[in-house]
Amino acid sequence: MSTIKDVAKLSGISRSTVSRVINNHPYVNEEKRIRVKAAMKELGYVPNSSAQRLRGSKTKTIAVLISRIVNPFFSGLVDAMDSVATEAGFQLILCNTRGSKEREMTYLNLLRTKQVDGVIFASIENNWDDIKPYLAYGPIVLCNEYTDQTDIPSFRINHFQASYEATLHFIKQGKKRIGLCRGDETLGSNLGTDREKGFIKALQDHHLTFNEQWLFRNATNFNDGRHVFQKVERMSERPDAIFTGSDEVATGIISESRGSSIHVPNDLSVIGFDDQQIADVITPGLTTIRQPIQKMGEQTMQHMIHILTNQLSLVGHTELLKTELIVRGT
């Protein structure tokens, strides 16, 4: 195991300065700080306090990374995980990345420093190549979001199929000008890409063309939904249906449509995703794709605890859970 002496030698910085960098001392030259950090990373150096944890007992703590704590999907998912963890004598640390690549890597560093025994990604911000090295420090399991580059356990739905079924419902209703909302395309997850592929395939199978103007990017929350509707209002050729990929975005569209000459669902049909509580409360009721959120959270945490309790090696496995189209008024 590397020591401060090794870091000092590799970086060409004195041991006392290395120590100040490790302890986040404010009076350290930035150039020296960068050299020390680079040497620590190259050597895989773990500070003494964390190294002691490495040699000692496990923390029985699991970090769960999400992107937006205010999203009801994540709160339901984490609640299910927490129930399983508590019953098994483990505790959960909730890490809210706010969509930041830097925050995600900071939280992931909890695994390297042995402050947690394992990490569950319910959202992914960085590319897998940046995350993969941390498998050397403990198990990582994916829940909800995923990437084809991994060979680790994953618990999710078939987003291609769910998107296909939602689009097919529009087509059966006679809709021909169908739009799509999707999230951030720069993320390391395949979720948004697979939804778009399922959407396009349904159109192709029924000989419908897709207008790129009806693809609304980076739409993830209520306000984004309002902005989507505002864009639709300004279009000369408008979509007659939009698959939003999010109940939050869908309710934003519906809310913004009130008082407009474009009515939901007569002029614009909408389908959400998740089946959050608001889907059954809003008027008109929101047609949406129901995800088995509780089951997904429970199975993910159960698998992580099984790995940790039995000290098992990670084996690539994908558990696909079933979705359901809930037809309401939109």
Residue ranges and their predicted role:
Residues 121-165, 209, 248, 274-286:
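Flexible loop/hinge segments that line or gate small-molecule binding clefts
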Residues 1-60, 73:
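N-terminal helix-turn-helix DNA-binding module of bacterial transcription factors
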Residues 177, 210-214, 263-269:
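Short acidic capping loops at alpha-helix termini that bridge into adjacent secondary structure
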Residues 34, 46-110, 114-117, 196-200, ...:
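Amphipathic helical "hinge" segments at domain boundaries
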Residues 67-75, 95-102, 155-165, 181-228, ...:
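Hinge/beta->alpha junction and helix N-cap segments in small-molecule ligand-binding domains
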Residues 229-330:
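Flexible loop/turn connectors
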Residues 17-20, 54-70, 177-186:
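Short beta-strand segments enriched in small/hydrophobic residues
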